[in-house]
């Protein structure tokens, strides 16, 4: 993690502009072709949810602007963000939030996430003040066409919130809607486009 020198930061003017906005957050929703991911997890007997969480995390960390954070009034560039996933408890309508680093490949991450989820007995199992997270969730019961998230009113909140819905058939391909909610002080449409391109390319390469 390194502190950003705002006097020479290429984003300083935009950061100050959006810092004056009372609600600098926005959300976009787009379609993702998950045909190859669906095939891959079926062949490898992996969780689609955890596998997508792995790929989403990789795509987030590939775009520098997603890794900016505010700490103690200063702007910092994080080394990486860590996925924090909502996960339904087996046989229950209640969920808990599973947080773990993205290590190894997809299969290793899926196994680690499954083991941690099974062992976790509380809603949270991490430092709630940690702002290097990615909030990840899924609504597999319906197609997602838009999403907003609960939050405290804090313009310094820089945690990306990423949610996707149920996949379905579209012209012989499996696609789903994905919502990404971000802070405009750091992230513009250009950066969301880079995230999408990386995610789709990684899925297509499976």
Specify the residue positions occupied by each region the protein language model found.
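Short, charged, low-complexity patches
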Residues: 45, 49, 106, 188-192, ...
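Acyl/amide activation-and-transfer machinery of modular secondary-metabolite enzymes
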Residues: 21-39, 80-104, 175-181
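Active-site-proximal acidic secondary-structure segment that organizes catalysis
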Residues: 156-206
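Hydrophobic "lid/gating" helix adjacent to the active-site nucleophile
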Residues: 46-83
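Aromatic-residue-lined binding/catalytic grooves and analogous aromatic/hydrophobic interfacial grooves
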Residues: 3-4, 30, 40-44, 59
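Helical lid/core segments from catalytic subdomains that handle acyl or acyl-like groups
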Residues: 89-144
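Short amphipathic C-terminal alpha-helix that caps PH/PH-like domains
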Residues: 56, 110-117, 195-203
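Flexible, Gly/Pro-enriched loop and linker segments at secondary-structure and domain junctions
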Residues: 1-29, 124, 132-138, 143-175
């Amino acid at each position: 993690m390194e502190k950003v020198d705002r006097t020479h930061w290429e984003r300083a003017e935009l950061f100050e502009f959006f810092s004056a906005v009372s609600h600098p957050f926005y959300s976009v929703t787009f379609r993702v072709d998950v045909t190859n991911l669906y095939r891959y997890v079926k062949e490898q007997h992996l969780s689609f949810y955890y596998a997508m969480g792995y790929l989403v995390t990789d795509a987030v960390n590939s775009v520098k602007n997603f890794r900016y954070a505010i700490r103690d009034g200063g702007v910092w560039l994080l080394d990486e963000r860590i996925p924090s996933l909502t996960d339904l408890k087996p046989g229950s309508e209640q969920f808990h939030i599973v947080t773990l680093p993205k290590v190894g490949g997809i299969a290793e991450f899926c196994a680690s996430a499954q083991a941690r989820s099974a062992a976790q007995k509380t809603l949270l199992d991490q430092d709630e003040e940690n702002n290097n997270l990615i909030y990840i969730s899924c609504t597999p019961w319906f197609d997602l066409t838009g999403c907003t998230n609960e939050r405290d009113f804090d313009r310094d909140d820089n945690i990306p919130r990423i949610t996707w819905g149920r996949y379905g058939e579209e012209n012989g391909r499996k696609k789903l809607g994905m919502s990404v909610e971000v802070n405009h002080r750091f992230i513009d449409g250009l950066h969301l486009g880079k995230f999408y391109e990386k995610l789709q390319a990684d899925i297509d390469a499976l």
